[in-house]
Amino acid sequence: MVKNRNERQVYFMLHKIPDNLTGRDMDILNILWKSDEPLTASQIASSDQGLTINTVQAVIRKLLKEKLIKIDNIVYSGTVLCRSYCPTMSEDDFALSQFNCEYRKIQKRISKSTLVSALLGSEKNPDVIKNDISELQAMLDEYKEKL
């Protein structure tokens, strides 16, 4: 998983979230994100009444191909060896990566400063706005030092 802000920036530049994710794909990702430990296909299928093992296995193949999940380990399920799976990024990192991909599509029409202004303008609590501005200022100072 991506650890710090610099790793996140590099990760988001290199990894594009596929546009063809379905509701089922997201269902399985959500199950994996909510789990404290890696899950087998049968554990994933049993955690949602609407999922069959065949659907889960098909989605797992797709998510593995897209590198959104990985095989964590080989474990016993009863007397049978099974693969256990875990996500390759956190739910927050996934959301940020999606946002980054969407922003790239509109960045010629909406500048970063306009976007930040709109986000700050949508917040009603002045204390939260002040805190956000302080965090943004620290980030900008960090970027200036790197230039």
Regions found by a protein language model. Name each.
Residues P38-S47:
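Short acidic, hydrophobic short linear motifs in intrinsically disordered regions
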Residues M13, I17-R24, T40, I74-L96:
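Short, cationic-aromatic polyanion-contact patches
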Residues W33-D36:
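Short helix-capping/hinge SLiMs at alpha-helix to coil transitions
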Residues V2-D27, M139-E142, K146:
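Short alpha-helical segments that sit at the start of domains
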Residues I28, A58-E66:
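Basic amphipathic alpha-helical segments that dock to polyanions
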Residues D93-K144:
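Amphipathic alpha-helical dimerization/coiled-coil segments
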Residues L51-T52, V56:
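Short coil turns linking two alpha-helices in DNA-binding domains
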Residues L64-Y76:
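A short, conserved structural fragment
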